[in-house]
Amino acid sequence: MAIIPSPSPSHFSRRAHSFNAAAAQYAAHRPSYPPALFDTLEELTGRPLDGSRVVDVGAGTGIGTALLRARGADVIAVEPGDGMAAQFRRTLPDVPLVRGDGNALPLADACADLLTYAQSWHWTDPARAVPEALRVLRPGGALALWWNTSPLDVPWQEAQANRIGCHFGIERPEDRNADADRSALADPSGRLGFTCRTVRWSRHVPVDTHLANLGSHSAFLVQDPATAAAFLAEERTHLLAAFPGGTVEEVYDVELMVAVA
């Protein structure tokens, strides 16, 4: 489930910081990414991850970082949040981590072959983050953005998205952005030429894991705890009706965008 942050600056900031108190929940229950994503990333960048100097920005608890490293990349992580950074260090103590964000990268010019933003570019200001990416990338380097999203051609996921929208008043991303160009949203300046791909995958998890994953999204983290808990309790009933065995098949579309500098 990808829930787009509110455009209100104060609410946006509150949501961006909400993950720090839920870092352990985030690390334990958020979905990973499939091998096909990294195969596609290598195809679009025209270079292997093995041996590449990669900066993973907004690294969070290190879900994407660990997979990049497993592909042989030499990774540096950048993370602004205290709680997320602490969880990252517990999970990946041997991976260099610097504190900062994509709007002002604490890195030297032309130091990276690849900048990655796994589930994090939407927390940046593109007017600042795009020039920073171009500054840090080496000639021929690439910027890669990706998000796990919930495709609404899966009936139970569409029904759940509708319930979330009704209960919390959250605009569904597909409703808001269906006619918008993804590249223009990611880079309103038009300086980057993105190639977009979608990689579908799925995982099977217990109902409790799915609910904990859902509850780790900022829209829930900033809600009154009793309100969020009531929604998740009701959601459990819906899920058990759809999956009486107690195991949920979560289907994801990873939306990947790659721009070569």
Residue ranges and their predicted role:
Residues E42, A66-R69, V130, L134:
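A structural alpha-helix within SAM-dependent methyltransferase catalytic domains
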Residues D113-A127:
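A short SAM/SAH-binding and catalytic strip from SAM-dependent methyltransferases
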Residues R128-R203:
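Conserved catalytic/acceptor-binding region of the Class I
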Residues N103-L114:
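A short acidic, Gly/Pro-enriched loop at the edge of an enzyme's catalytic core
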Residues V55, T61-A104:
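Class I SAM-dependent methyltransferase SAM/SAH-binding core
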Residues D181-A261:
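Conserved Class I S-adenosyl-L-methionine
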Residues M1-D50, M84:
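Conserved class I S-adenosyl-L-methionine
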